[in-house]
Amino acid sequence: HELLISSGVGARLESAAIPFYPGAQEAAAQGLIPGGAYRNLDYYQNAVQWQGDSALKDDTLILLADPQTSGGLLIAVPPARLEALLASLAQSGVAGRAIGTIEEAPAGTMIIA
C-alpha cells in the first residue's frame, strides 16, 4: 500500500494467483482468524475495491489482511522484465509468481479480482 501511495498509482491483484499457506483457507472458513487481521482489514478498507467472486470475498480479504503472512517479499518490476526475473528466482530456488499489475488509479488503491 505504501509503495502505491508513494508512486501515485494503484494495483490490480489477482486473488487466485496469491499463494496462501496450506490449510489457511480452511482455517479462515472455520473462523480461525487472529484479531490483528480484523484490525488490518479495517485500516485498509477504504483502499480496497473487491471485484472478484462475491462468495470468496470475506475469507480472501481476511487472509490478505492476516498479519502472520505479512512477511512475504513483494517486488514491482516492469512487465518486459517479468519473465527474466521469474527465471532468475527459479534458478536460485526461490518460488516467484506474478500476482497483479500496477494501474492508473487513485494512489494506494488496491483492486482485488
Regions found by a protein language model. Give the residues of each.
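Glycine-/charge-enriched secondary-structure boundary and capping motifs
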Residues: 1-113
